[in-house]
């Protein structure tokens, strides 16, 4: 992203700040700025250019707990580290941030040291199923036939209410859902239904019956935090994760979903969303911001995993804020900011590829997969080592153009099935842009980029591999970094052992 006079900001931990660092590239090298906070306190990192000077700063809503009651001394519980290097941003990140990341509670374990079901480690493809009608069921079964099964279906609208409303009153479930779950599982696939782990609709029966007002996050004046989404126009309240009322609701939902619907676990949305400072006097945390938000969700998910998650089931969430890596078996990466002036770079896999499983790249198109971004997303998704797809299967066979996109996804899925020796626990090393016959195209919602891209990975055994993907509909002959030529057919990928 180009730096301008308008401040660029990153709200940690959340979708637009998965890690605690900002870097600035220039002709002289890279400047590195990182508040190294092992407690994952909420913070806003800002960078701004004015009159030729660039300023970096961290803004926080302080916790009352940061002031010592005896000495009245106020301490910010982290140290900010800065540095400069003649190399680029990737060198700075690996040199300085990765050692910090591996010293934190969330980055200390490799993927193999975590208790993740083997079936998930071997997963390659996700679908986003919506509703329970015949159109959806037909598309789901066609996807299983077309891609060869072993698909994870992330299921929305399995209850009786519209999106972003009536949270957390999902039960009773639509009676059509459990038989569909059974059918999909009998075909060798998995089903994970959606719930929200952060919002409570104040108009629900449960908000009154379970005293939801005592669980709500509060502003300094005692007012509620409310969020209104265009999907429902409902003023949902933001719930404080420290509340035992809310924790019990989430744990009860986990039990009910698994026991009554027989799913393979559940998806809990917005746990990794940006925290709010909470000033509720009846909550068991110091007023203000600080570490309570992360600690509360960490403890909630630890209890869920220890006492409520059935054998070989999983729990996953949206986005990839680093501190939530141990809380979930896999993270759905779909909200990363991007536009023609803001390009996504492989910063997260550079740091955490051997620590975490992810699926998707950014939001898959909602209505049309033929505009170019779907193909680009899945190329990048593959190269980042992420599990592919997260697409609505109803979109894949509506016409010949859509079928071609489905073919590309199948080609990459079949290739990925043979790469678990690298992608499961391996390290992303570097992005590769082959030269030669490698056209630049204007990708819808992303901007200009090459049709052929690549990446170098290192397997857990230390073996280096290069992947190259051609997202174009014609064959190209390109030159690799070692000077060798590679001819690559349309909508395919290749593995090259180094």
Regions found by a protein language model. Give the residues of each.
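Surface-exposed amphipathic alpha-helices with a cationic face
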Residues: 144, 178-189, 301-310
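Active-site-adjacent "subsite" loops/lids of carbohydrate-active enzymes
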Residues: 175-183, 190-261, 337, 342-351
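Aromatic- and acidic-residue-enriched carbohydrate-binding clefts of CAZyme catalytic domains
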Residues: 152-175, 206-241, 274-298
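Active-site-proximal substrate-binding groove within the catalytic cores of carbohydrate-active enzymes
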Residues: 59, 70-78, 293-490
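Carbohydrate-recognition beta-sandwich/jelly-roll modules
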Residues: 1-152, 170, 183, 187-190, ...
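Active-site neighborhood of glycoside hydrolase catalytic domains
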Residues: 238-330, 341
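Hydrophobic faces of well-ordered beta-strands that scaffold small-molecule active sites
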Residues: 125-127, 151-155, 191-194, 266-268, ...
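Short, acidic/polar
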Residues: 132-146, 246-259, 374
């Amino acid at each position: 992203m180009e730096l301008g006079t308008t401040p660029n900001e990153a709200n940690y931990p959340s979708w637009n700040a998965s890690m605690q660092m900002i870097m600035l590239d220039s002709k002289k090298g890279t400047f590195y700025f990182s508040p190294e906070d092992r407690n994952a306190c909420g913070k806003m990192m800002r960078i701004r250019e004015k009159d030729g000077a660039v300023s970096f700063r961290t803004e926080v809503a302080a916790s009352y707990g940061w002031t010592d009651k005896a000495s009245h001394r106020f301490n910010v519980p982290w140290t900010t580290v800065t540095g400069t290097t003649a190399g680029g941003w990737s060198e700075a990140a690996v040199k300085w941030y990765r050692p910090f990341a591996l010293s934190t509670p969330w980055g200390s374990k490799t993927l193999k040291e975590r208790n993740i079901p083997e079936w998930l480690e071997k997963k390659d493809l996700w679908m986003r199923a919506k509703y329970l009608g015949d159109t959806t069921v037909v598309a789901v079964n066609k996807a299983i036939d077309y891609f060869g099964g072993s698909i994870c279906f992330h299921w929305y609208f399995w209850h009786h209410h519209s999106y972003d409303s009536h949270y957390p009153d999902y039960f009773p479930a639509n009676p059509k859902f459990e038989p569909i779950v059974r059918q999909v599982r009998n075909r060798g696939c998995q089903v994970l239904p959606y719930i929200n782990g952060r919002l409570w609709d104040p108009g629900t029966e449960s908000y009154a019956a379970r005293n939801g007002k005592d669980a709500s996050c509060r502003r300094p004046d005692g007012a509620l935090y409310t969020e209104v989404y265009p999907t429902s126009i409902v003023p949902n309240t933001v719930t404080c994760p420290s509340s035992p009322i809310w924790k019990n609701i989430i744990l009860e939902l986990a039990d009910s979903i698994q026991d009554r619907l027989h799913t393979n676990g559940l998806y809990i949305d917005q746990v990794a969303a940006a925290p709010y400072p909470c000033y509720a006097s009846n909550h068991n945390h110091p007023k203000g911001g600080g570490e309570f938000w992360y600690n509360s969700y960490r403890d909630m998910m630890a209890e869920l995993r220890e006492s409520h998650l059935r054998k070989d089931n999983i729990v996953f969430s949206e986005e990839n804020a680093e501190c939530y890596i141990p809380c979930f078996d896999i993270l759905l990466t779909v909200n990363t900011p991007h536009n023609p002036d803001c390009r996504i770079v492989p910063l997260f896999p550079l740091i955490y590829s051997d620590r975490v499983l992810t699926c998707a790249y950014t939001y898959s198109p909602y209505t049309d997969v033929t505009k170019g971004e779907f193909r680009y997303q899945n190329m990048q998704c593959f190269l980042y080592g992420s599990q592919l797809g997260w697409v609505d299967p109803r979109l894949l066979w509506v016409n010949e153009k859509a079928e071609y996109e489905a073919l590309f996804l199948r080609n990459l899925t079949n290739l990925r099935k043979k790469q678990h020796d690298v992608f499961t626990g391996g390290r992303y090393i570097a992005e590769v842009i082959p030269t030669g016959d490698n056209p630049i195209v204007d990708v819808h919602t992303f901007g200009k980029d090459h049709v052929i891209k690549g990446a170098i990975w290192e397997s857990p055994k230390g073996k280096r591999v290069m992947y190259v993907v051609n997202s174009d509909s014609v064959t190209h002959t390109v030159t690799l970094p070692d000077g060798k030529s590679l001819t690559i057919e349309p909508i395919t990928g290749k593995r090259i052992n180094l």
